[in-house]
Amino acid sequence: MLTKRIIPCLDIKDGRVVKGTKFLNLRDAGDPVELAQYYDDEGADELVFLDITASAEKRDIIIDVVERTAEKVFIPLTVGGGIKSIEDFRRILRAGADKVSINTAAVKNPNLIKEASEIFGSQCVVVAIDAKRHYVNEDEIDKINKNVVKVEDGYCWFEVYIYGGRKETGIDAINWAKKVEELGAGEILLTSIDKDGTKSGYDLILTKEISKSVKLPVIASGGCGKPEHVYEAFVYGKADAALMAGILHYREYTIEEIKKYCADRGIPMRLL
């Protein structure tokens, strides 16, 4: 089994790190460069920067934050938010990022995935999928052309959302994951909108369904509240990596504690 990764996520708005619940109610969590350095020292395997205002408010990319971070941080850095073109990819990678994450742009122009992976290599292309449960009655299952799964409280399919979780697309997340793999993406960053910020654990059913439908590495995101949740994402969700924000930003747990919890239970982790 490959080493599982712990990835702090820094949601950035107006050049500051913020953390919200279900994509709303942001509260300031600090300076991105300082936090990135702190997590690098703490033993994070990678970092994700998401400029959460960029796609929705058409804000330009946070190039200077990326440049300042890349000078001080030597673990892989993924940057997303507001990336719409090959030129945006080029600028982000030139600023020092290792990978670029796209969500809204990928849904609106799937060919961008193919183009970017051909030009920069699929290892640089991360497709972020923000998904939400769409519940259906049992008697409707055969009538809708979606991957309906049984969940704790009924039946649902998982719908892809864009513009920072604000707009539904009608697209089935399982089908979309298969499509982005076909188009040449190197990794999927999968966020459960239902779980985001709740600290009640990842959506293990969503994570498992996506993980088993593709060969790509899947990063579980949304809902991490304690080390046990990370362990569950790896064991039951079949995730390759776990993304988290609030529990780290507010020092509820350290990366070392999370890694040790998983390693003690047989999960291969890179320990300091």
From Swiss-Prot:
Quickly give the catalysed reaction: 5-[(5-phospho-1-deoxy-D-ribulos-1-ylimino)methylamino]-1-(5-phospho-beta-D-ribosyl)imidazole-4-carboxamide + L-glutamine = D-erythro-1-(imidazol-4-yl)glycerol 3-phosphate + 5-amino-1-(5-phospho-beta-D-ribosyl)imidazole-4-carboxamide + L-glutamate + H(+)
GO CC, sorted alphabetically, is:
cytoplasm
Report the EC code(s) recorded for this entry.
Answer: 4.3.2.10
Keywords of the record, alphabetical order, are: Amino-acid biosynthesis, Cytoplasm, Histidine biosynthesis, Lyase
Q: Which SUPFAM superfamilies match?
A: Ribulose-phoshate binding barrel
CDD domains registered for this protein in UniProt = HisF
Q: Where is the active site?
A: D11, D130
Protein role: IGPS catalyzes the conversion of PRFAR and glutamine to IGP, AICAR and glutamate. The HisF subunit catalyzes the cyclization activity that produces IGP and AICAR from PRFAR using the ammonia provided by the HisH subunit.
Checking HAMAP family in the record gives: HisF (MF_01013)
This chain belongs to the protein called: Imidazole glycerol phosphate synthase subunit HisF
